[in-house]
Amino acid sequence: MAETGDRSVEVVELDSLRVRLRIRGYPVVFVNAIRRTVLSDVPTMAVDYAYIFDNTTAVYDEMVAHRLGLVVLDSNEAVEKYRRPEECAGKEPSEEDCFVEVSLEAEVDAEGETGRYITAGDLSISDPQVKPVYPETPLIYVAPGQRIHVQAFARLGRGKEHTKWSPASLSVLRYTPILIYDSSKAGDECLECLSAYPQVVEALKSGGKGSLVLEGLRRTSGLRYCAETACRGAVEVRYDSSNLDLEVESTGALRPEKIVELAIRELEEKVKRFAEAVESVGVEES
């Protein structure tokens, strides 16, 4: 846990694809800006150009290019190694510090009895660090007598340009729910309705009035339903906007903790550029 005064950030959950942070004391707008930046501004690698030299399969050229673009590529090293998307705008694919070559060439003998499924693992990529995260992803079926030859190029891009570059399949911000309760108004019907929330039932059975902070409770729709029906007047659900849960689920292109780190870095750079723009305009003193 990292603490600064009344503010703290705690890693509640972390694995290869998911990170959940408990954030206290920071403004909602600031944390939400990080959440949005995760989806729209953190760069990853994805195929952007595809040249189809030969394709006699049943899959249209446009569909081949589309499927290649959706292949999730490992971008953990690429984000530090290759030039940023805006620096590569208008550049030719031959620019090695902007693009990675991705090629596919396959043919099945006409005399063969069965065809072959081409997967993401069959792609030849010029940079071994930019490899398919899910190599078993099926791309094309090549039947006997068919062939395909594609040369493609991947580059860094951002989710706001196309979702194939978004590093996260999920980026959610949740408030911490607080339950205000009055045991004197809670009948048997109310307790039965709340049976899925043993912590709440225990508080109501203890007697008296009070509040209960439900940290870690992600879904409160059932709780709100009970509050509005069987427990009307006995319980009320509120939310603490200063105690937040930020959950990010990676597509696999980047480690989840790196996604959050890069989102904060991107946000800092935006603020810096904005401050420089304001300074360049100048502010007249009154």
Curated annotation (Swiss-Prot):
It is an enzyme of class 2 (transferase). It holds the Pfam family RNA_pol_L. It is found in: Cytoplasm. The keyword Nucleotidyltransferase applies. The keyword Disulfide bond does not apply. Keywords: Cytoplasm, DNA-directed RNA polymerase, Nucleotidyltransferase, Transcription, Transferase. Its EC number is 2.7.7.6. Disulfide bonds: none annotated. GO terms for cellular component: cytoplasm; DNA-directed RNA polymerase complex. It catalyses: RNA(n) + a ribonucleoside 5'-triphosphate = RNA(n+1) + diphosphate. Belongs to the archaeal Rpo3/eukaryotic RPB3 RNA polymerase subunit family. HAMAP family: RNApol_arch_Rpo3. This is DNA-directed RNA polymerase subunit Rpo3. It comes from Aeropyrum pernix (strain ATCC 700893 / DSM 11879 / JCM 9820 / NBRC 100138 / K1).
